[in-house]
């Protein structure tokens, strides 16, 4: 018995000693005699990933950053600290100057980096990383997501989708709707119509199936890379495969329709991908143009669905929340939107010029994105050693920038918790401080797409309804995008009814 007790004590001592050694070694503050930013690396393999996720689960993703800036950067909101995230040695940077450094030095000091779960969710037959895939996709963006003439084509489509979604009665009037869920459904309708010309009312089975898998994918796409049957990551990978397989079949059908003249090359992003070579005949070694195959088209359309859906749905959902909490802002938007409506004939669809008149509405939407940005931040990878604020950022380390480090910085946005659309009037906030879409050459190419969709929706919702929050203090969870814990239940009141009640 004494021998067993002694051996047990020695085993515990060995484990504690070994763990202490690993922690001390793993948290070494220097590299080749050069000073790394202060911080802590957490435990081997895990690092501080759990703390990173837990801050979002508590609805305060910014606390992970601000708490460590307070401890390791003496409260400097433009500082930095080292940590370990997603199994990688990382440095978290904060402030507009850091944003400018990263956004302005793509391929010079840094390159884009995605967690392993992203590479798995968006596979390429050419064995490209998610970063390389993103660069390839930018070949297609100008013709469909950036140029004004392309964007103008979307507005009537978005308007028509919005009117038809309202006609389903999903928005009320009602004593209770779960606004977050209805918003998710609406924005997926629009994405399927714009990117693949799939009409949710004409082909509800396809859209519903894609949407079910899509929600599973979103729940695990940014989770820890642990592929076991019960993990969110495992379920997300299965959902990714299901969506990509479905899109491949849609692409095969569209290819036949293009050959028969039943579809046209500029119809939507799907047709454009099928008809546009990624390598011209002149640049090809065999003198033949190279096109995307169906599998890679499935991956790229999936990426568009994620990007085109999540930003808009998140912004619209929290627009409801902040308008309910700030009725004076809602009334100012209502006045502006009624002025636009007064210029339209009955049934006439919105156009580009109409949306340009919605200036205050867009200021309010920007304030929504400041307080609840759809994207919390992103990673870069250092491709060479360089310094920032006097500290070494070593080659190969990951660098994380966060929207919250500037969006909630009181030195940039006084009273940062206050909802105030006037912050965006005139010249707006300083450069590199408002970054819901990132910045530099890696700025989200869907920024204008999201702007058009959200403004189109705002026009219809405020001219038809007022609303009240049923749970004013509902908890907000961020994982990885913000969402209300109880799906934002609202009482929807028709404008005519609200006038009668008044």
Swiss-Prot record:
It is an enzyme of class 1 (oxidoreductase). One of its GO terms (cellular component) is membrane. One of its GO terms (molecular function) is monooxygenase activity. It is a single-pass type II membrane protein. Glycans are attached at residues 88, 181. Soapwort saponins possess anticancer properties and are also being explored as enhancers for endosomal escape in targeted tumor therapies. They may also serve as precursors for vaccine adjuvants. The chain crosses the membrane at residues 3-23. One of its GO terms (biological process) is triterpenoid biosynthetic process. It catalyses: beta-amyrin + 3 reduced [NADPH--hemoprotein reductase] + 3 O2 = oleanolate + 3 oxidized [NADPH--hemoprotein reductase] + 4 H2O + 4 H(+). It is found in: Membrane. Heme binds at residue 444. Its EC number is 1.14.14.126, 1.14.14.-. Mainly expressed in flowers and flower buds, to a lesser extent in young leaves and, at low levels, in old leaves, stems and roots. Pathway: Secondary metabolite biosynthesis; terpenoid biosynthesis. Keywords: Glycoprotein, Heme, Iron, Membrane, Metal-binding, Monooxygenase, Oxidoreductase, Signal-anchor, Transmembrane, Transmembrane helix. Its cofactor is heme. Gene3D superfamilies: Cytochrome P450. It holds the Pfam family p450. Its main location: membrane. Belongs to the cytochrome P450 family. Component of the oleanane-type triterpene saponins (e.g. saponarioside A and saponarioside B) biosynthetic pathway, leading to the production of natural products with detergent properties used as traditional sources of soap. This is Beta-amyrin 28-monooxygenase CYP716A379.
């Amino acid at each position: 018995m004494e021998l067993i007790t002694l051996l047990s004590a020695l085993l515990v001592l060995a484990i504690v000693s070994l763990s202490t050694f690993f922690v001390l070694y793993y948290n070494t503050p220097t590299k080749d005699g050069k000073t790394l930013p202060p911080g802590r690396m957490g435990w081997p393999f895990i690092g501080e990933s759990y703390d990173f996720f837990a801050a979002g689960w508590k609805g305060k993703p910014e606390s992970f950053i601000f708490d460590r800036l307070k401890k390791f950067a003496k409260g400097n909101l433009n500082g930095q600290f080292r940590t370990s995230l997603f199994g990688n040695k990382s440095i978290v940077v904060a402030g507009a100057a850091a944003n400018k450094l990263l956004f302005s030095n793509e391929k010079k000091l840094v390159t884009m980096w995605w967690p392993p779960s992203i590479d798995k969710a968006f596979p390429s037959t050419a064995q490209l990383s998610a970063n390389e895939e993103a660069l390839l996709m930018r070949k297609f963006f100008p013709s469909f997501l950036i140029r004004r003439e392309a964007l103008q084509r979307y507005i009537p489509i978005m308007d028509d989708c919005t009117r038809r979604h309202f006609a389903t009665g999903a928005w009320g009037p009602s004593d209770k709707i779960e606004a977050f869920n209805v918003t998710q459904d609406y924005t997926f309708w629009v994405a399927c119509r714009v990117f693949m010309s799939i009409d949710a009312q004409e082909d509800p089975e396809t859209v519903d199936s894609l949407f079910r898998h899509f929600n599973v994918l979103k729940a695990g796409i940014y989770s820890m890379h642990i592929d076991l049957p019960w993990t969110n990551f495992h379920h997300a990978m299965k959902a990714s495969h299901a969506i990509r397989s479905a899109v491949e079949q849609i692409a095969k059908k569209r290819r036949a329709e293009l050959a028969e003249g039943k579809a046209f090359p500029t119809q939507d992003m799907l047709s454009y991908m099928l008809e546009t070579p990624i390598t011209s005949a002149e640049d090809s070694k065999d003198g033949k143009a190279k096109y995307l195959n169906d599998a890679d088209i499935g991956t790229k359309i999936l990426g568009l669905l994620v990007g085109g859906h999540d930003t808009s749905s998140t912004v619209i959902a929290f627009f409801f929340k902040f308008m309910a909490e700030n009725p004076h802002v809602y009334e100012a938007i209502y006045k502006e939107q009624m002025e636009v409506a007064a210029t339209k004939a009955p049934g006439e669809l919105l156009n580009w010029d109409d949306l340009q008149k919605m200036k205050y509405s867009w200021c309010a939407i920007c304030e929504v994105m400041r307080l609840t940005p759809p994207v919390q931040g992103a990673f870069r990878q250092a491709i060479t050693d360089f310094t920032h604020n006097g500290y070494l950022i070593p080659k190969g380390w990951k660098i994380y920038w966060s929207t919250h480090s500037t969006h909630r910085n009181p030195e940039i946005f006084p009273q940062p918790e206050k909802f105030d659309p006037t912050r965006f009037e005139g010249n707006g906030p300083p450069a590199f401080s408002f970054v819901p879409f990132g910045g530099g050459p890696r700025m989200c190419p869907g920024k204008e797409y999201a702007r058009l969709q959200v403004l189109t929706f705002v026009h219809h919702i405020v001219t038809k309804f007022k609303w009240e929050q049923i749970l004013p203090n509902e908890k907000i969870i961020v994982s990885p995008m913000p969402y209300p814990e109880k799906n934002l239940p609202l009482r929807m009141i028709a404008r005519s009814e609200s006038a009668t009640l008044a």
